[in-house]
Amino acid sequence: SVGFKAGVKEYKLTYYTPEYQTKDTDILAAFRVTPQPGVPPEEAGAAVAAESSTGTWTTVWTDGLTSLDRYKGRCYRIERVVGEKDQYIAYVAYPLDLFEEGSVTNMFTSIVGNVFGFKALRALRLEDLRIPPAYVKTFQGPPHGIQVERDKLNKYGRPLLGCTIKPKLGLSAKNYGRAVYECLRGGLDFTKDDENVNSQPFMRWRDRFLFCAEALYKAQAETGEIKGHYLNATAGTCEEMIKRAVFARELGVPIVMHDYLTGGFTANTSLAHYCRDNGLLLHIHRAMHAVIDRQKNHGIHFRVLAKALRMSGGDHIHSGTVVGKLEGERDITLGFVDLLRDDFVEQDRSRGIYFTQDWVSLPGVLPVASGGIHVWHMPALTEIFGDDSVLQFGGGTLGHPWGNAPGAVANRVALEACVKARNEGRDLAQEGNQIIREACKWSPELAAACEVWKEIVFNFAAVDVLDK
């Protein structure tokens, strides 16, 4: 009979459509689905498509007032995950009209909203998203991108060097500024506010901005190189955040910083727009990411958070080190490093990339390697990340036995030695330690650093690894 028929019907009758041909304008998602016992995978995949688009738990008569065929998400393919019991990859296609233009916030509210608390699923993880060019073009993206940043800084042909000022909390503004000066004077390109430095009683933001700007200009004058300090503009309200960014611009500094996950995508996109309009570079820290991305069966993979950041806007983002103290398997890390930097990335399941991604003209983001790295890691980092990256040594600079400036000198000498060796055709993976030892002969600072950190390793297996 025609007309409204009340009652509950299975999701898969409406939302599981294996015959569907995906459109170029669809947003495609790959979900790792772990259904509850007794729930067939088709029903679980269809439930994800329904609950993250037009569906609800029962038939409603207002369905008759719209075209569900036009607006519904569709689960169009399901694959069993090899080597895992009761895990499936469900592919879902979303029509573009479901999403507001230029809003990462709206995209995530749909795709990773209520559906993650759905009772029929034991666990759910968003592994990857394909953002169609039609949607990419509605975003400004990074304020400047890799090439414009190099032109602003006049630094080419090598990775950039940074350092997070430690201890991260407790220093006064003047002492903080002094540490910034010493690191920049020693040869680093950037120093960085820690992500939790905002405006606390021991150091208010305005005092920190002033002393850091003074340090920066002094180091610039003495070295003849352009220097930067990531001034953390993250604040409790968007208005306060923009106020801090305005003050940074008035001081004439080149770069500010934001914690994009704790601050939120709306705040981040607002700041990115301000930065492009006012010539500021934007460094992004990913505090809170491991809460979301570290478990293999539930949450959102970091490659999705990285894509979202490229859309929302940021010129640098922390992306793991492969060799330091923080999580990150090599192939997975290189997969999302490519997604940050390149214009076009082919599907490659061996690196965890589920979809071919075309960024059209969206600028690239520099990946930042940071966390437990020191001079002995320099050859590996140079080889893994290449020139378009920022290598950040916090303890690896400030922990030098002779002080901050010699720590910076050691890092700069090690980097220049690795870049020179690579350009001469030497194999950094095989000869790395030899290259560093040779450089020690003419740099006592580097020799001292090598002696201190020769035994330090962080040998733990990664939690989030590729499927077999």
From Swiss-Prot:
Sites of N6-carboxylysine modification: 192
Annotated Gene3D superfamilies: Ribulose bisphosphate carboxylase, large subunit, C-terminal domain (3.20.20.110), RuBisCO large subunit, N-terminal domain (3.30.70.150)
One GO molecular-function entry: magnesium ion binding
A single cellular component GO annotation: chloroplast
One GO process term, biological-process aspect: reductive pentose-phosphate cycle
Active-site residues (renumbered): 166, 285
Keywords on record: Calvin cycle, Carbon dioxide fixation, Chloroplast, Disulfide bond, Lyase, Magnesium, Metal-binding, Methylation, Monooxygenase, Oxidoreductase, Photorespiration, Photosynthesis, Plastid
Residues with the N6,N6,N6-trimethyllysine modification: 5
Required cofactor names: Mg(2+)
Site (Transition state stabilizer): 325
Catalytic activities: 2 (2R)-3-phosphoglycerate + 2 H(+) = D-ribulose 1,5-bisphosphate + CO2 + H2O; D-ribulose 1,5-bisphosphate + O2 = 2-phosphoglycolate + (2R)-3-phosphoglycerate + 2 H(+)
Enzyme's top EC category: lyase
Protein residues bound to Mg(2+): 192, 194-195
Remarks, miscellaneous: The basic functional RuBisCO is composed of a large chain homodimer in a 'head-to-tail' conformation. In form I RuBisCO this homodimer is arranged in a barrel-like tetramer with the small subunits forming a tetrameric 'cap' on each end of the 'barrel'.
NCBIfam families, sorted: PRK04208.1
Family matches, as HAMAP family: RuBisCO_L_type1
Quaternary structure annotation from Swiss-Prot or TrEMBL: Heterohexadecamer of 8 large chains and 8 small chains; disulfide-linked. The disulfide link is formed within the large subunit homodimers.
Protein name: Ribulose bisphosphate carboxylase large chain
Organism phylogeny: Eukaryota, Viridiplantae, Streptophyta, Embryophyta, Tracheophyta
